[in-house]
Amino acid sequence: MKVLVYRKCSTCIKALKWLDEHNISYEERAIKEENPTYEELKEWYTKSGLPLKKFFNTGGMIYKEMGLKDKLKDMSEDEQLKLLATDGMLVKRPLVIGDDFVLTGFKDKEWIEAMHV
C-alpha cells in the first residue's frame, strides 16, 4: 500500500500514526517532492470511483491562488489530471493507494472499512 503525504500536514501525520497503531504496513511517498504523474493519477482516479474533485486539495493555498474553484468546471477530466500532475500540493492528502481501493484525505471510518480493520 502506498501513502502519499506531506510531512508538514497535521492530518497526514495523524493518518500515519493511525496506520502504525493498527499495524498496517505502507510505503510512504513525499507528495511534494515526488508528485504523482499524470499516468498514476489517471489510474488511481479510475480505480477509485470517486469524483475527480476529491483528488484536489481544495483547502490548499495553490488551489485558492489559481482560482480553481471556478475554473475546474470548465476543464476536461484530462486537463484536470494534467494540472494535478504539475504540483503535488494540488493533490488531496493523504492519498492512499491499496490493491483494491484509493482513499483521499483521512476519515477513519472510511479507512477502517477499506482496510478491514
Which stretches of residues belong to each language-model region?
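Local sequence-structure signature of Cys/Sec-based thiol-disulfide redox active-site neighborhoods
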Residues: 1-22, 26-31
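Thiol/selenol-based redox catalytic cores and closely related redox-interacting motifs
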Residues: 33-117
